[in-house]
């Protein structure tokens, strides 16, 4: 098996070279993964797909870091509900996170009812002086943090629901 791979990858002894430059093997040997890369772009975010494809570290030179970071954080947090990854990209990406909220149709449709309730909770907590209420009137940082917290809470509730649904399905199977 290893012989055929080396032959497909290049010319005879260049198998050693392929070990150092893996970018050469996927293109000639397996043309199929390109569609998988496109799926990665759509499904998991640009950052992951670029890291898997030939571009790798070059991508950071021409892709603005903030958009890659925000896409990565969205994709990783959908798998694990911890909010640790969310706080960092928000501080660097400026207003981009806000634009994500407006253009993301899933956020509105999936958690529409929950979102309304959460807005009420946020309003009441601000009125009660929950620390950030003093500065939230003017500073965009607080507005961004509120959005980040809302999205983190929304993600947690969504993942919790998915877990519960999965448990129900498991129970049905048993």
From Swiss-Prot:
Compartments reported by the entry: Secreted
Alphabetically ordered keywords of this record: Plasmid, Secreted
Compositional bias (Basic and acidic residues): 79-89, 162-174
Highest taxon above the source species: Bacteria
Residue span of region Disordered: 1-174
Compositional bias segments (type: Polar residues): 50-65
Chief place where the protein resides: secreted
Listed Low complexity bias regions: 66-78, 147-161
Gene Ontology CC: extracellular region
Function: Probably involved in host-pathogen interactions.
Name of protein: Protein PopB
Species lineage: Bacteria, Pseudomonadati, Pseudomonadota, Betaproteobacteria, Burkholderiales
This protein's encoding gene: popB
């Amino acid at each position: 098996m290893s012989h055929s791979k080396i032959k497909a990858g290049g010319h005879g002894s260049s198998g050693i070279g392929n070990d150092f430059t893996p970018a050469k093997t996927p293109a000639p040997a397996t043309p199929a993964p390109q569609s998988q890369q496109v799926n990665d772009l759509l499904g998991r975010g640009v950052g992951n797909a670029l890291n898997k494809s030939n571009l790798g570290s070059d991508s950071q030179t021409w892709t603005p870091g903030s958009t890659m970071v925000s896409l990565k954080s969205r994709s990783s947090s959908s798998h694990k509900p911890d909010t640790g990854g969310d706080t960092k990209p928000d501080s660097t990406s400026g207003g981009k996170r806000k634009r994500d909220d407006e253009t993301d149709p899933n956020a509105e449709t999936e958690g529409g009812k929950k979102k309304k309730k959460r807005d009420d909770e946020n309003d009441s907590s601000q009125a009660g002086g929950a620390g950030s209420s003093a500065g939230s009137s003017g500073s965009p940082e607080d507005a961004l943090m509120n959005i980040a917290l809302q999205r983190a809470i929304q993600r947690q509730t969504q993942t919790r629901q998915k877990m519960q649904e999965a448990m129900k399905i498991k129970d049905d199977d048993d």
